[in-house]
């Protein structure tokens, strides 16, 4: 974790908690486009773990779901 200097004092940044672990999600559905769009940048790239806050297991499932939904044209590969 990175230390953040704020007002002359160093404060430790809070660790992000995986949203899918909190919800006890078994798997991530590739057809749930609204949820998948939260983990894609405006350029169409998949957000990394350190930004999205997901755990390694759910990041892999998220990546597979995004790639699968791109292949069946539910999500765009890139944006203009």
From Swiss-Prot:
Gene3D superfamilies: Ribosomal protein S18. One of its GO terms (cellular component) is cytosolic small ribosomal subunit. Signal peptide: none annotated. Keywords: Ribonucleoprotein, Ribosomal protein, RNA-binding, rRNA-binding. Pfam families: Ribosomal_S18. One of its GO terms (biological process) is translation. GO terms for molecular function: small ribosomal subunit rRNA binding; structural constituent of ribosome. SUPFAM superfamilies: Ribosomal protein S18 (SSF46911). Binds as a heterodimer with protein bS6 to the central domain of the 16S rRNA, where it helps stabilize the platform of the 30S subunit. Belongs to the bacterial ribosomal protein bS18 family. PANTHER family: 30S RIBOSOMAL PROTEIN S18, SMALL RIBOSOMAL SUBUNIT PROTEIN BS18M. Part of the 30S ribosomal subunit. Forms a tight heterodimer with protein bS6. This is Small ribosomal subunit protein bS18.
């Amino acid at each position: 974790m990175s230390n953040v200097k704020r007002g002359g004092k160093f404060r430790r940044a809070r660790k992000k908690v995986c949203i899918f672990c909190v919800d006890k999600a078994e798997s991530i559905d590739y057809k749930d486009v609204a949820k998948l769009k939260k983990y894609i940048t405006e350029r169409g790239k998949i957000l990394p773990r350190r930004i999205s806050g997901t755990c390694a297991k759910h990041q892999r499932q998220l990546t597979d779901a995004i790639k699968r939904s791109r292949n069946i044209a539910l999500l765009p590969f890139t944006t203009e």
